[in-house]
Amino acid sequence: MSGVNEIRSMFLDYFRKNGHEVVPSSPLVPRNDPTLMFTNAGMVQFKNVFTGLEQRPYSTAATAQKCVRAGGKHNDLDNVGYTARHHTFFEMLGNFSFGDYFKERAIELAWNLITKEYGLDAKRLLVTVYHTDDEAFGLWKKIAGLSDDRIIRIATSDNFWAMGDTGPCGPCSEIFYDHGDHIWGGPPGSADEDGDRFIEIWNLVFMQYEQITKEERVDLPRPSIDTGMGLERLAAVLQGQHDNYDIDLFRALIAASEEATGVKAEGDRRASHRVIADHLRSSAFLIADGVLPSNEGRGYVLRRIMRRAMRHAQLLGAQDPLMWKLLPALVGQMGRAYPELVRAEALISETLKLEETRFRKTLERGLNLLEEASADLSEGDQFNGETAFKLYDTYGFPLDLTQDALRAKGIGVDTDAFTAAMQRQKAEARANWTGSGDAATETIWFELRDKHGATDFLGYDTESAEGVIQAIVRDGTVVESASKGETVQLVLNQTPFYGESGGQVGDTGVVTTESGKLTVTDTQKRGEGLFVHYCVVEEGSVKTGEAAALAVDHARRTRLRANHSATHLLHEALREVLGTHVSQKGSLVAPERLRFDVSHPKPMTSEELKVVEEMANEIIVQNTPVVTRLMSVDDAIAEGAMALFGEKYGDEVRVVSMGQGLHGSKAGKAYSVELCGGTHVSATGDIGLVRIVSESAVGSGVRRVEALTGEAARAYLGEQDERVKALAAALKVQPSDVLGRVESLLDERRKLERELTEAKKKLALAGDGQNGSGEAAREIGGVRFLGRVVSGVEPKDLKSLADDGKKTLGSGVVAFVGVSGDGKASAVVAVTDDLTSKVSAVDLVRVASAALGGKGGGGRPDMAQAGGPDGGRAAEAIEAVAVALAG
């Protein structure tokens, strides 16, 4: 019986032997497709290859692609754990031909693999073809020897694939496995096709057409192949299982869950273990690929997945965070095939643990509210969608969990009402927001890009150049010329001005023509490679077609270079100090400062920040050359270059290396090696100095480091030095003795504050003629009573003052009211232990509170506190307590 890892390896090895390039899985967040939330199929990373927008050095490929389907039309979340084949995370095995082989070779490769390599019984296999695809029908008969009744023609869209309304498309052919007549279900196309007897294991897509319009379809000049086979389904078949959760990989994860919870995966507990096993996979892989839990976008989908698993952990009786404890089992099963799991293990573990710790409070509160709201419902009823939305919006309790919790009772949720409430809230939010209108002008840049081509960027080698003005845009419209005082955008054939990207802000400077002069206030990248210069015409006029002299602001660019290079050094130093889980989540490289966001689950200590800064400055002091090379992405990664998550890279990339490592695994090697399109210093010494000035949180699991370099850092340190000198002069000590003197003064102040508090308490107890009612204790109904309005005593000290009053009385009741500077009053009543059976401090302090215009009050029978807004009635409050005591 083959394990999942062996099955995956056999697939890739088979296609490698048959001339295919084995391409690594792309990340779960698509690099080149903003229309997708997650990678959900093997062909996603090849989409631009199929459409002809991208060229690869190979014409056939094979992959084992990690996929997530947990959002949009592919949202299987509700079914996961309760069915045999629904997953949020799965692996798709696929082979691809980009204009190389077509139907015959694709069918031959597929049939030989599953029958000869994997050894499946051909008698248990049948296939489907699109109803008009006679060619595929004939090839299955020829290659596989299948009889006509085992080649089923399907007329629905299930057997015709399209990339979209337009673009490549073509018929499909699916291979099905017959699990046997002991399982209910009919073959595809039959009335019972939804049964579980016949299971699709492989889909072959024959891309042979291009959809031009809804009515027009033409043949592709180079037909292609895209296939996809679910690894988990295939493993179930090869391991003699009918249920994906019974394969070796899931058995190992479920066993770990059973051991951690002490609960067997039996009966109604079975689904919970399955949910946890599945959701652990998707959560871990998403975190490894740079997604962190949040309240929007991909991060929110991840949070929903994690929280659903955590809800099932709670159902299994887990008292403490569970999922992070199961991570080693997952890494053991899949870490060799996907080393990113190993690299990110610490981050995944911390994130799972932290999220579950935070969520337990939300879960407990949400379940209690849900229980109250559904108490009157019975099986078959619908839970109010508005209430479900309130649970989500106010208490952070996701709809998935509401549905999951009510499922056991047979209660549904009115999702239409939930959606309506959600849409209503969004509409209200939109009504309160006014857009900038920038989107309306965005198409202009694509049109100009199509007309003139991409701008040639010269700024790596020079800060000045000559160019030709290709277009002038004013107020979103292309114009022929612009005059003094007008604000416009220029597009030129080439430029030394850097367009904002990779966190580095755009260059500024001057553009000069024969007839005019412009100040460049910003430079942006638009429309796939177009550099747009935002300008103000300062002198004369400019017109399309003119030659122009371009000059970047040298001093500003110099500061940008230093700050950008410093981010690379800080990035590497943070990874050295905090761990390799650290990855860049965002940055701002501005001329005056740099800002750097990284993945890390907790605040950095002052010692960690000190070491990070020291390591970066060590490399700066080396003053070694900063080396830039051009190479392919694969070669760069192979050499250890760090690719920043979410960045889009072409076939050829710039690799920036700087410094020589001095410690650990970096010793003797390049210290920092990153893929980067920004501008950098020539040597590390040009940075001058880096100084970290702050570290803070910007979101769950993301920390922000802000720093200064060069002159800005020196100025900052100079200002700090001047402050210390001024402080030393004020304290009449040397600068080196400031800390000791301040600590001494603080100790002295604390001592004086304690003495002052004690003096105020003694004065209040003794009475000073200004403390209102009751300068001495009096007897009321046989009980000694000491009541005073006290001045100069903080509310927090009233209790200890009351304790002292009890000691003074020996037996009796003490009531003190203090008035703060804003006119509000605080009251305390204390009763000696011998009287608490007769007199309650809580009852008496509530009387005082009422007199002060307050409500309530609380504490113990021997000591209670309250307050009120009307401090002017403090004396009345004391007398009210006396009257109540006499009562």
Curated annotation (Swiss-Prot):
Keyword terms: Aminoacyl-tRNA synthetase, ATP-binding, Cytoplasm, Ligase, Metal-binding, Nucleotide-binding, Protein biosynthesis, RNA-binding, tRNA-binding, Zinc
Catalytic activity: tRNA(Ala) + L-alanine + ATP = L-alanyl-tRNA(Ala) + AMP + diphosphate
Chain sites annotated for binding Zn(2+): H564, H568, C676, H680
EC number annotated for this UniProt entry: 6.1.1.7
PANTHER family in the cross-refs: ALANINE--TRNA LIGASE, CYTOPLASMIC (PTHR11777:SF9), ALANYL-TRNA SYNTHETASE (PTHR11777)
Family: Belongs to the class-II aminoacyl-tRNA synthetase family.
Cited NCBIfam families: alaS (TIGR00344)
Name the record gives this protein: Alanine--tRNA ligase
Protein species of origin: Sinorhizobium medicae (strain WSM419) (Ensifer medicae)
GN (gene name): alaS
